[in-house]
């Protein structure tokens, strides 16, 4: 059972990283947060941020970023 658990954890991690990398290809490059306002305007209840030279639209719920 221990081997199965670790295999499932590894497979789930690989899937999360693969989908995260795919999503990152659609992001817009930025130099500051103001560049991200128009990109994030397509979403509701988000806060634009320029993180790692790319626009991120952060949604805060209960103090946890999703």
Curated annotation (Swiss-Prot):
Disulfide bridge positions per record: 30-50, 36-55, 40-57
Keyword Disulfide bond found: yes
Record InterPro entries: Scorpion_toxin-like_sf
Main location: secreted
Superkingdom of this protein's organism: Eukaryota
Gene3D superfamilies, per the entry: Knottin, scorpion toxin-like (3.30.30.10)
GO (cellular component) term, any one: extracellular region
Signal peptide as annotated in the record: 1-24
Cellular localization per UniProt: Secreted
GO MF entries: potassium channel regulator activity; toxin activity
Tissue occurrence: Expressed by the venom gland.
Transmembrane as UniProt keyword: no
Protein keywords: Disulfide bond, Ion channel impairing toxin, Neurotoxin, Potassium channel impairing toxin, Secreted, Signal, Toxin, Voltage-gated potassium channel impairing toxin
Function comment: inhibits Kv1.3/KCNA3 channel.
Additional observations: Negative results: does not block Kv7.1/KCNQ1 channels.
Family recorded in the similarity comment: Belongs to the short scorpion toxin superfamily. Potassium channel inhibitor family. Alpha-KTx 30 subfamily.
UniProt free text on domains: Has the structural arrangement of an alpha-helix connected to antiparallel beta-sheets by disulfide bonds (CS-alpha/beta).
Protein's recorded name: Potassium channel toxin alpha-KTx 30.3
Organism of origin: Scorpiops jendeki (Scorpion)
